[in-house]
Amino acid sequence: MKELKRNYSFFIDKKVKLVKFVDRTFNCNFKFSTAIWEFLINAETNTQFHFEISADILKPQELELLRRAPKDRFQFEVGVQTTNDEVLNRINRFVNFSDIKEKVVELLEIKNIKQHLDLIAGLPGEDIVSFKKSFNDVYSIEPEEIQLGFLKLLRGSSMREEAEEYGMRYSPYPPYEIIATNDISYDELLTLKKSWIYGR
């Protein structure tokens, strides 16, 4: 922990504008995450720190700590992916959207942390109707930003091994992005991509 704090202090001393933590579930270790957040909250700096978190597992003690964070000191990226609980279970994410939403709303009420909520198009079992509902569910929360990604079937991943089962067609070139599935067509994915690019 001392070594980590020395590293963070280096960024602070150099007046780095943004530091991104690449751990996709930064707060899965309560003791570790609260120690880091406490240190960064108390630091004298304008550096912003970006974390990818699992909002549904935020504890009351963490929320209370985060209330003390200077405005814009932290930004959180929350991987919603879909609000369809059946699809979440299919991709081995055993969490309900209602639990994510509850904590995201609590963070929004604090008004000092910018939140990015991520959606993924092309998930197995999610058709265009389900995706639209996912988007509307997330939009209704009014986060600062919604980010849309398209499913990537990386080599060695369990989802790639199940590609045939769900009729998932994907590019043969890295990063192996989804082209179509049994549930969502190529044209529908292309429309989503164009709408996202030109509608931003």
Question: What are these model-predicted stretches?
Answer:
Residues 61-66, 124-142:
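Catalytic cores of alpha/beta
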Residues 11, 70, 138, 196-199:
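Alpha-helix boundary/capping residues
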Residues 100-103, 134, 192:
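Hydrophobic side chains in well-ordered alpha-helices
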Residues 30-31, 86-91, 124-129, 142-189, ...:
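Flexible glycine/acidic-rich beta-alpha junction loops that bind and position SAM and/or redox cofactors
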Residues 37-38, 134, 163-167:
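Short, hinge-like loop/turn segments at secondary-structure boundaries
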Residues 3-124:
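Conserved SAM/AdoMet-binding glycine-rich loop
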Residues 1-2, 98, 129-132:
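Residues in well-ordered alpha-helical elements
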